[in-house]
Amino acid sequence: MGFYMLLTVALLLTSLMNVEATPVNQAERSALEKSGLGNRIQPRYDNCGDAEADCYQSKCMDEETYDEECEASCNYVVANCI
């Protein structure tokens, strides 16, 4: 049993030593912060009708014109209306 504990600790330590940090310049970091999932401002809907109207409009049905507004309204429909 002691051998397996020692082996586990050794493997954990070697895996931690092999982790490499990748540098990120400030422009990339601020772009990542602005586009992060937690920072999105989602529109507020009082009912499902407005969200469904936004989600099912023609611009949201086309892959090339699908944007964050479409994603927010469609996510609202999936989470609250279906």
Curated annotation (Swiss-Prot):
Main localisation:
secreted
Q: Residues of the signal sequence? A: 1-21
Protein name per UniProt? Turripeptide IX-07
Places the protein is found: Secreted
| Tissue-specificity statement | Expressed by the venom duct.
Q: Which UniProt keywords apply?
A: Disulfide bond, Neurotoxin, Secreted, Signal, Toxin
Q: Which domain of life is it from?
A: Eukaryota
Q: What is known of its domains?
A: The cysteine framework is IX (C-C-C-C-C-C).
What disulfide bonds does the UniProt entry report for this chain?
Answer: 48-70, 55-74, 60-81
Its GO CC terms are: extracellular region
Propeptide per record: which residue ranges?
22-39
Q: GO MF terms on file?
A: toxin activity
